[in-house]
Amino acid sequence: MNVVQSVDSVALLPAYLAAGTAVLVLITDLLVARPRATLAVAALGALGTAVGSALVGAGAERRTFCVGADCSWIFGGRAALVAVVVALLTVGVLGLSVPALRTGRSPVGEYAFLLACSMTGGVVLGAAGDLITLIVALETLTLPLYVLVGLRRGSLASAEAALTFFVVSVVATTLTLLGAALLYAVTGGLHLDRLGALIAEQPELRDLPLTTAAVAVLLVGLAFKVAAVPFHAWAPATYDGAPLPVAAYLSTASKLGGLVALLAVVQRALPADQTGPVLALLAVLTMTVGNLVALRQRRTVRLLAWSSVAQAGYILAPLGALALAAGRTDEARSAAYAAAIAYAVFFVVLELAAFAGVTALRPAGADGGTLDDLRGAARRHPWRAAAFGLALVGLAGLPPGLAGLFAKVTVVRALLDGGAAWLALVVALNAVIGLAYYLRVTAALWAPRPLAAPNVGGAAAVPVVGVVGVVLAVTTVAAVVLGVAPQLVLDLAGR
């Protein structure tokens, strides 16, 4: 008897669209050889992927590649949310890349192809139902970024950042695969739901030293991916050395992918009593170290990089509560899951808006510069600076950045419901620390520039490329909409 079900092509439509985009970009670059056409195909393909994912996710949950009740592909509302966010992020990053690509320092075809490949990994990741699919999708998301970070010609900083990112990612991937192999050795299964059921039904498996080692190694490997402290050292140097649009993608799509993978294994596969304390400790270390080090940063991208480390801590906090909430109500566990996903989506929108603001305020192809380069930017570019400032106060969790405020409130409420009041207090204290550097950058935008300041990049008026302005406007509007109607994300995250 054939126990393998037929393939559901509708469920796989988002993956088809994403992978097809990568192929079409290659063909367009080869046959048409016009950068504008190549970028247009990549952007339209990403938009098509977002639309297709939304349409498939709007219906009932679809499963395929199943053996019995265990499926390797599960596409529902949450998977659709991740796929749509990753696809739209790709469109935004392509738009931010236009000024840098016009300088000719990066090949357009390869650049767009690598972004499309990374998008494919992100789309598959949200629907992964087993460890192999999960890890392959995560690496498909990450591998193209090694090249994108170092693709800028003649830049030693980019080459060093790419090498650092590659070495650290190899270690992370090795640990993740080792953890998966050890779990397979213990349970004989790879499907996430099956792993969770086996460990729950057989307490003797959970108590094995090999199971503890497998959980620890797997968590460490995924912690590298999200730049959680103490596995974070690669992130600031990599972000600062990468081109601005690539740094934006790294701090959003790449981090979202790692968090989705971590959330999937914590919620569905790993024993909660082992993961809870570890994730809670990682969350405290990550948000505290990220905020404290960000206070001392003078370079814009490094500050955003350290702030993204801190933001990862806020997202990890509900995962600790999710594990600690085991044995409590299903509602508490669902709230923790929804809080983590919702915060990640809010963060991604605000972080992309922040990077769009930096790109709009800097000369084409330039790096993020220093905070001094941004002084007085609002006097020269009031609307761009206002959008950038809105993103910063949103990341800080202050009005009028209501999206960030609701994100933090959602996390704190989930922690309280999960019985982790002490962790909620740590989140609140760190949010106060974060106010210092977010408001410092925001204030610098409106501060007068010293009369003796040299006229370096950012000191004079910078003409904005139209598509960068569009990305900045769209992300700002999205942040405002999510702030006014956060339930749009919370409902999907809770499904």
Task: Specify the residue positions occupied by each region the protein language model found.
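Alpha-helical transmembrane segments of multi-pass membrane proteins predominantly involved
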Residues: 1-495
